[in-house]
Amino acid sequence: MSNKMWGGRFTERPDEIMEDINVSIDVDRHLYAQDIAASKAHAAMLAAQGIITSGDAKNMARGLDTILSEITKGSFEFKRALEDIHMNVESRLSELIGPAAGRLHTARSRNDQVATDFRLFVRDEIDDIDAALAAYQQALATRALEFAGTVMPGFTHLQTAQPVTFGHHLLAYVEMAGRDRGRFADARERLNESPLGAAALAGTSFPIDRHATAQALGFDRPMANSLDAVSDRDFVLETLSAASICAVHLSRFAEEIVIWTSPLVGLIKLSDKFTTGSSIMPQKRNPDAAELVRAKTGRVIGALNGLLIVMKGLPLAYQKDMQEDKQGAMEAFAALSLAIRAMTGMALDLVPDEARMKAAAGEGYATATDLADWLVRTLKMPFREAHHVTGRIVALASKQGVALHELPLEAMQEVEPKITADVLGVLSVEASVKSRTSFGGTAPKNVASQAKAWLKRLEKQRK
C-alpha cells in the first residue's frame, strides 16, 4: 500500500524513478511564505463559515506561525518524501497540533492551493522588481541631469549620426524603464484575482466564502470560473513577457557600456567596482558586470518561451505539466532583479570622458543635417535638394580630409554659391545640440527639464 496522502486507492509504492520525477519541493519550497499565508486565510474563513471550530482555526494559525518561524530560521526539515511545499507544511502542522491539521484541507485542493501560492509569489516579485526599476530610473535621471549638456555622438547603425547629449541618451533608458514598470503594473492588475476555493476544478459543496479569503490575501476579487482558476498560468506568462522586454532594455544599455568602455572607443570608464581582471593578462579591465547582464537576458526570455511551450497543448483543467511552471520563472525573476541592481550600480559608477565624447560627436560629419536644415531655413531650399547639396559638400570635405566646420566657405560656395558665412555658426556640435529644442529633443535645456520632471515624478511615487 502507498503511504502517500493520495495513496488510498493504490496497492503498490511508487517506483523510485516516479518519486524522483514527481517531487517538487526543491523548487516550490520557495513558496513557503505564500503557502502559509494562504492556509491561514483559508483556516480563518472555514471557522467563520462554521465549517471548522474557531479553536481549530486558532491552533492552525499558531502552528502555521511556528512553521514560518522554523523555515525562516533554517531549522525546518524539508522532506522529499512529502513531495511539495503543501504536504511538508501540512505534515509539520500535524506534528504540532495533531489530527486537527487534517481539517485544514477541507474545501481545498492542491490545485487551487498552488495556483494561489504562485499568484502571491509572482505578485511579490512584481512589487520587488518595480521598486528596483524605480531606483534604476532615479540613478539614470540623476546622472542625466548631471550630464544634460555633455555632448556625445548619437548613433544609427552604430555609425555616428547626429550629436546628442549624454544626459539625453540616459533619459531614453529612463523612459524605457517607465514603460517596463507600466507593463508590470498591468500584469499585476490582471493577476490580482484569487483562485483559492476553486478546489480541484469544479468548486466545492462546502459553504465557503471566497470573497473573504480573497480580501484577506490582498486580492481584488475571487476568480469567477473554477476551471480557469486552476488551469491557467497566463499571469506568469504575462509577467515573464514584461520581464523579457525589460531584460532586453537592460541588455541594450549593457551592450553600449561594453562598447563604450573599450579602449578603441573610450567614451566612458567603469571603476574597479564593476570590472574584473584576467588570469593571464595583467593589463585587462573587463566589463564583466555589463556582459553578465547581457547574458542573463537569455535566461529571462528562455523562461518565457519554455512556459509557453509547456502550456500550449494542455486541455483543461490542471495537468502535472504545470509543475514545470515555477523553476524557470523563479530563476528569471531572480536574474532580472540582479540585472536591474547591477545596471543601477553601473549607471551611478560610470564616468564619461567628456573630451573624447565631444571629439567623437564631431566625427563622421555628424552636423551634416544641421547644414541641410540651414539651407532649408535660410535659402528656402526644398529639403530633398538641401540633402543633395549637403551630400556634395560632405563629399568635398571628405576628399580634403577636413571636418565640416573646417571646410573653407569658398569650397562650400563652389557647390552652392548662395551659402554665406552664417552657416559656420550651425556646424559645431555644441550649436547642433542647442538647436534641437523640439519637445523630446536633445537640447541641454530640454534634457535638464525632462530629468528634473522625472526626479520629481519618482519622488512623488515614493510618498
UniProtKB/Swiss-Prot annotation:
- Does the keyword field hold Lyase? yes
| Subcellular compartments | Cytoplasm
The yes or no answer to whether the keyword Transmembrane helix is present is no
Q: What class of enzyme is it?
A: lyase
SUPFAM superfamilies associated with the record: L-aspartase-like (SSF48557)
Q: Which UniProt keywords apply?
A: Amino-acid biosynthesis, Arginine biosynthesis, Cytoplasm, Lyase
**This protein's GO CC annotations:** cytosol
Where this protein primarily resides, as one coarse class? cytoplasm
**GO BP term, example:** arginine biosynthetic process via ornithine
Stretch forming the signal peptide: none
Q: GO molecular function terms here?
A: argininosuccinate lyase activity
Concerning InterPro entries, the annotation shows: Arg_succ_lyase_C (IPR029419), Argininosuccinate_lyase (IPR009049), Fumarase/histidase_N (IPR024083), Fumarate_lyase_CS (IPR020557), Fumarate_lyase_fam (IPR000362), Fumarate_lyase_N (IPR022761), L-Aspartase-like (IPR008948)
Q: What is its EC number?
A: 4.3.2.1
Cited Pfam families: ASL_C2 (PF14698), Lyase_1 (PF00206)
Task: Copy the pathway line from the protein's UniProt record.
Answer: Amino-acid biosynthesis; L-arginine biosynthesis; L-arginine from L-ornithine and carbamoyl phosphate: step 3/3
From the UniProt record, list the reaction(s) this protein catalyses. Answer: 2-(N(omega)-L-arginino)succinate = fumarate + L-arginine
Give the top-rank taxon of the lineage listed in the UniProt record for this protein: Bacteria
Q: What PANTHER family does its record include?
A: ARGININOSUCCINATE LYASE (PTHR43814:SF1)
Q: What family classification does the UniProt entry report for this protein?
A: Belongs to the lyase 1 family. Argininosuccinate lyase subfamily.
Q: What is this protein called?
A: Argininosuccinate lyase
Name the gene for this chain: argH
